[in-house]
């Protein structure tokens, strides 16, 4: 069968050239309108194979603007994002700029960036503090010499010694103080033997002071320049305790090298029983201001051992509840003054009639239950009357009315009886007396 080629004329407005290819040729080829014959390829394989390259050209032509946009950004970066200047250096691109910023200007959160002015001020302050501490050390040597002279004329016994306790304040910060405590000679010798390996220079470097004591107490000398901001101990003894201040840092106390061999189960300081009351001691322990011992308050600390149980020394006053004595006691018989003052009331008047049985109960029901279940054989005897006690008749109703002699178990019942029974009787008697007086006068 011969092949047929049918020419198709398109309107002139469809013949638009795009990238050198006309839409007329594309559509004509897609529908098989070409000089080639369809032949046996009516299934469409031939004209589809010829059409795919032309469609791929159209897709490639549409991706050209995206490549142009990327190149535009590159050209923009090359034109403006280069030749940076920082710290007198010329940085060619953004990468060098970021690297320079991270190396020179970036500060991490964990770094402690201190201003230069602050560091200079701190150095000057440290130098001035060092010179001040040197002057204080010289003053301390003079003070210890004077203190030794005072100890020669004081009333302290010969079997005691003075041990300096150096507590560094805030790890060597300005404001240290010195504490001297009078201890027995045995404790002083033990402390000296324990610290014999240390040189005198190291020992003197830990002892610093900022004040001069006014007087050497009989048993304890404490003077402090400033209490520490950490944990402190406050002890208030005597009336003049507010004039002295003593505080120690619990954290720095471990570093001290002059601690005598104390028994830590006891308190460090000992006081006489007449020093302070328990109420004053409780109030002072709760107050935030540290207050310390006066010289007159520690007279008995010389003759007695240095360590003493504070719980046995301080005699606590009875509380308000303990001071108020109760109106009656359960251990002794209760005597009622009003009404029925001649009666004696026992808490458990009903006693068991069985010989050698000391059980007693408040009411008959308790005694009845005991008689049925308290012994091997039930007791069928009737419950007796209340047993006389010490020659007096025990009454279960001790409150008696003075008007009608009626008795009640408690005072409330007697009050109710008086209010509702005898008030009307007394009013009737008053009216009767008024009438009798009127008739007599008439």
Swiss-Prot record:
Residues 193-219, 304-333 are annotated as: Disordered. The keyword Secreted does not apply. Coiled coil: none annotated. Keywords: Cytoplasm, Metal-binding, Nucleus, Repeat, Zinc, Zinc-finger. Disulfide bonds: none annotated. GO terms for cellular component: cytosol; nucleus. GO terms for molecular function: DNA-binding transcription activator activity, RNA polymerase II-specific; RNA polymerase II cis-regulatory region sequence-specific DNA binding; zinc ion binding. One of its GO terms (biological process) is positive regulation of ribosomal protein gene transcription by RNA polymerase II. A zinc finger (C2H2-type) spans 350-375, 399-422. SMART domains: ZnF_C2H2. Transmembrane segments: none annotated. It comes from the Eukaryota. This is Zinc finger protein sfp1. It comes from Schizosaccharomyces pombe (strain 972 / ATCC 24843) (Fission yeast). The lineage of its organism: Eukaryota, Fungi, Dikarya, Ascomycota, Taphrinomycotina.
């Amino acid at each position: 069968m011969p092949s047929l080629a049918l020419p198709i004329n398109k309107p002139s407005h469809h013949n638009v050239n795009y990238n050198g290819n006309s839409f007329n040729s594309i559509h004509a080829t897609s529908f098989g309108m070409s000089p080639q014959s369809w032949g046996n390829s009516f299934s469409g394989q031939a004209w589809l194979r010829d059409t795919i390259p032309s469609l791929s050209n159209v897709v490639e032509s549409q991706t050209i603007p995206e490549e142009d946009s990327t190149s535009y950004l590159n050209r923009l970066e090359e034109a403006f994002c280069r030749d940076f200047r920082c710290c007198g250096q010329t940085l060619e691109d953004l990468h060098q700029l970021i690297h320079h910023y991270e190396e020179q200007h970036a500060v991490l959160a964990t770094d402690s960036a201190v201003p230069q002015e602050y560091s200079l001020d701190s150095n000057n302050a440290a130098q001035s503090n060092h010179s001040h501490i040197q002057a204080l050390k010289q003053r301390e040597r003079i003070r210890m010499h004077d203190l030794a002279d005072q100890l020669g004329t004081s009333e302290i016994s010969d079997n005691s010694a003075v041990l300096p306790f150096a507590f560094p304040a805030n790890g060597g910060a300005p404001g240290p103080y010195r504490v001297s405590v009078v201890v027995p000679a045995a404790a002083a010798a033990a402390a000296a033997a324990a610290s014999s390996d240390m040189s005198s220079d190291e020992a003197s470097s830990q002892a610093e002071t900022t004040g001069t004591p006014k007087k050497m107490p009989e048993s304890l000398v404490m003077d402090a320049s400033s209490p520490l901001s950490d944990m402190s101990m406050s002890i208030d003894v005597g009336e003049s305790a507010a004039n002295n201040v003593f505080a120690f840092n619990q954290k720095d106390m471990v570093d001290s090298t002059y601690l005598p061999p104390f028994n830590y189960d006891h308190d460090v300081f000992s006081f006489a029983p007449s020093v302070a009351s328990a109420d004053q001691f409780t109030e002072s322990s709760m107050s935030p201001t540290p207050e310390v011992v006066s010289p007159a308050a520690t007279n008995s600390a010389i003759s007695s051992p240095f360590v003493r149980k504070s719980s046995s020394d301080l005699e606590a006053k009875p509380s308000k509840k303990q001071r108020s004595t109760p109106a009656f006691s359960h251990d002794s018989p209760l005597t009622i003054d009003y009404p029925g003052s001649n009666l004696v009331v026992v808490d458990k008047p009903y006693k068991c009639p069985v010989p050698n049985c000391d059980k007693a109960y408040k009411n008959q029901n308790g005694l009845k239950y005991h008689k049925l279940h308290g012994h091997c054989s039930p007791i069928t005897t009737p419950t007796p009357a209340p047993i006389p006690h010490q020659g007096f008749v025990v009454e279960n109703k001790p409150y008696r009315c003075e008007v009608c002699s009626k008795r009640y178990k408690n005072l409330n019942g007697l009050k109710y009886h008086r209010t509702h029974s005898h008030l009307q009787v007394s009013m009737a008697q008053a009216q009767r007396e008024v009438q009798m007086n009127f008739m007599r006068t008439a």
